[in-house]
Amino acid sequence: MTVFEGNTVAAAIAAGLKQLHRTRDQVEVEVIAEAKKGFLGLGKHPAQVRLTVVPASAAPATTPTSATATAQQSVATESTTAPTMPRPTVQTPKSTPTRQAKTSQATTSAAKPATSKAKAVAKPASMAVTTGPVIADTDQSKPATTSKTKSVAADQSQTPRTPAEIAARQAANETAVRALCDYLLAVVKELGVTADLDVDFGNRYATLNFDTTKQGLLIGKHGRTINALQDLAQVYMNHHGASHVNVVLDVDDYRERRAATLKRLAESTAREVIATGKQVFLDPMPSFERKLIHAELANNHHVTTFSEGRDPHRAVVVAIRK
């Protein structure tokens, strides 16, 4: 049994099926938690599902006897409920064996299409037999898909189309970034750090580089302080209507040096897993750092990576590829 996560229940199931190399009818699904959007980016957590691979012997099989019985029952139901047309009564002196044979043959030929039709109807019914948890999860995945479609439609409706709308959106984003800079400088000042900000601003991104003599205090242990400030900055932009702008905070090229460190960590961890045959849990990381680990080992044919846990304690696991 393995726990998988995703933005929706359906996305979590899809990620699990891809990881396990299984189809939907080969696993049992148990929904552990629904996805929550949170408030202003706080309290948000993904949907969680637990997938259990169903043994091959447990798969339901439809026997020929049961299919034949179902077909015969369907034929009997059709013959009972079908309206009968009145037929004229013809008096004959004697029924010959030839006529009886023809009547019996006609009855048999008429029953064959009905029987085959009943079998054709019964076959999809037997294929639709699945375990209880999977059916329940399918019902829950429909509202998630609908809400995702509505969200995409809402984003498309809010996307500026005319040059005037694009210019207005750009001006609003610049205003939000300026306000964010003032807010961040006030926050770090309370930490005892005097700094300036260099801004690299685009249509959907904003990179803010702190210029200060107290880089270590602003970065924190393993980058925890700068990462917390970055999360706070993203929440600030979301609150000011610029959620589509991705904010990155940097100081003294820390992000570049951290990326190089993570790549070396991924390579050394992969060598350790290959040598020992045991999976290794890395320290908890933010999502953008976990993506660097996944990307670095994606082309390694000996190990595989996946994430476990919930933010902020979600961590990458490196294991032997099966």
Swiss-Prot record:
Keywords (A to Z) from UniProt: Cell shape, Cell wall biogenesis/degradation, Chaperone, Cytoplasm, Phosphoprotein, RNA-binding
Q: Which residues carry this modification: Phosphothreonine?
A: 89
Tell me, what is one Gene Ontology molecular-function annotation carried by this entry? Answer: RNA binding
Task: State the CDD domains in the record.
Answer: KH-II_Jag, R3H_jag
The phenotype of cells or organisms lacking this gene is:
Cell length is reduced.
**Any one of the GO BP annotations:** cell wall organization
For region Disordered, the annotated ranges are 58-162
Q: Which InterPro entries match?
A: Jag_KH, Jag_N_dom_sf, KH_dom-like_a/b, KhpB, KhpB_N, R3H_dom, R3H_dom_sf, R3H_KhpB
Instruction: Identify the PROSITE patterns for this entry.
Output: R3H
GO annotations of cellular component type? cytoplasm
| Superkingdom of origin organism | Bacteria
Localization:
Cytoplasm
Q: Where in the sequence does UniProt note compositional bias of the Low complexity kind? A: 58-82, 100-129
Gene3D superfamilies in the cross-refs: 3.30.300.20, probable RNA-binding protein from clostridium symbiosum atcc 14940, R3H-like domain
| Main location as per UniProt | cytoplasm
| Assembly description | Forms a complex with KhpA.
PANTHER family linked to this entry? PROTEIN JAG, RNA-BINDING PROTEIN KHPB
Domain note for this entry? Has an N-terminal Jag-N domain, a linker with a phosphorylated Thr, and 2 RNA-binding domains (KH and R3H).
Q: What is this protein called?
A: RNA-binding protein KhpB
